[in-house]
C-alpha cells in the first residue's frame, strides 16, 4: 500500500513543459492534500525548487520539502526569503536537499552551489533540520548511491561528519515517521546497522566500503 504522498508542487528540470520556478499548486490545494493525507495517517513530501512553491508548501504544513533550491526570478538559489524560512521553521518542516555524488564536480567552481550552501547555512542557523537524500531515479543517480553522496552533501551544507550521519539515520527516520523503530542502535529498535573498516565520524568516505550489513539483527551482505 501507499505509505507516503509526494506532490509536484512546482515544475522540474526533467519534466517536459514545466518550469522549476513556477508553482503548480496554490496553498489552498496543497492544504487540502495535506489534510486528506493526514486523515489517512500519511505524510506528504513536496517537490519544490522555487521560492513561491516553497512558501505554499510550508504554509500548507507539508512534512518534507524536497530540493528547496530557492529559485527566484533572478535565478537558482537567488530567491532566498527570510519570511519563508521563518515559516518553515515555525511549521517544523524537514528539508531534503537531494544532493547526490555528481554534485562533487561543482564544488569550488559553481556560484550556484556557493549560494545554495549559504542558504543552507542560514536554514540550519534558524533551526531547520536537513536530511540526506539523492533524488534517486533521475538519470545517473541510483538508489544505492547515498554512501558516496553523503560526503558531498556534508561539504556543501557545512555539516560535520557526525551531523551528516544523523541526517541519514536518526533524523531521516524521524522525518519519515520511523523514528520510534529505526535510525538508531538502541533497545527495541530494528537492529539495522552497518560495519566499516574505519570510523565514519572521522571520515565519511569509509561509507562507500561496508564490511557487513545487518537488517533486523541478521547479516544480509558481506563485502
Please report, for each region that a protein language model flagged, where it lies by residue:
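Divalent metal-coordination and catalytic microenvironments
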Residues: 1, 5, 37, 47, ...
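C-terminal cap of metal-dependent C-N hydrolases
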Residues: 170, 187-223
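Conserved strand-to-helix beginnings and helix N-cap segments that scaffold or border functional pockets
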Residues: 78, 143-147, 207
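Residues embedded in well-ordered beta-strands within globular domains across many folds
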Residues: 6, 66-69, 165, 195, ...
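Active-site core of metal-dependent hydrolases
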Residues: 8-118, 126, 131, 137-138, ...
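His/Asp/Glu-enriched, well-ordered alpha-helical/loop segment
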Residues: 114-199
Amino acid at each position: 500500500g501507499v505509505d507516503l504522498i509526494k506532490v509536484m508542487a512546482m515544475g522540474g528540470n526533467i519534466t517536459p513543459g514545466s518550469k522549476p520556478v513556477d508553482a503548480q499548486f496554490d496553498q489552498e490545494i496543497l492544504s487540502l492534500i495535506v489534510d486528506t493525507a493526514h486523515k489517512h495517517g500519511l505524510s506528504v513530501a513536496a517537490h519544490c525548487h522555487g521560492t513561491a512553491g516553497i512558501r505554499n508548501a510550508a504554509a500548507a504544513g507539508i512534512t518534507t520539502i524536497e530540493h528547496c533550491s530557492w529559485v527566484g526570478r533572478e535565478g537558482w538559489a537567488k530567491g532566498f526569503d527570510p519570511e519563508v524560512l521563518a515559516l518553515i521553521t515555525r511549521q517544523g518542516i524537514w528539508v531534503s536537499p537531494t544532493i547526490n555524488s555528481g554534485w562533487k564536480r561543482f564544488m569550488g567552481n559553481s556560484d550556484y552551489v556557493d549560494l545554495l550552501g549559504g542558504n543552507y547555512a542560514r536554514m540550519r542557523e534558524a533551526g531547520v533540520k536537513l536530511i540526506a537524500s539523492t533524488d534517486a531515479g533521475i538519470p545517473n543517480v541510483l538508489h544505492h548511491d547515498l554512501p558516496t553522496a553523503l560526503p558531498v552533501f556534508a561539504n556543501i551544507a557545512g555539516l560535520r561528519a557526525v551531523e551528516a550521519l544523523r541526517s541519514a539515520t536518526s533524523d531521516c527516520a524521524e522525518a519519515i515517521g520511523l523514528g520510534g523503530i529505526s535510525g538508531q542502535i538502541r533497545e527495541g529498535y530494528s537492529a539495522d546497522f552497518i560495519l566499516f573498516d574505519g570510523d565514519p565520524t572521522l571520515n565519511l568516505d569509509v561509507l562507500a566500503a561496508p564490511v557487513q550489513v545487518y537488517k533486523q539483527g541478521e547479516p544480509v551482505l558481506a563485502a
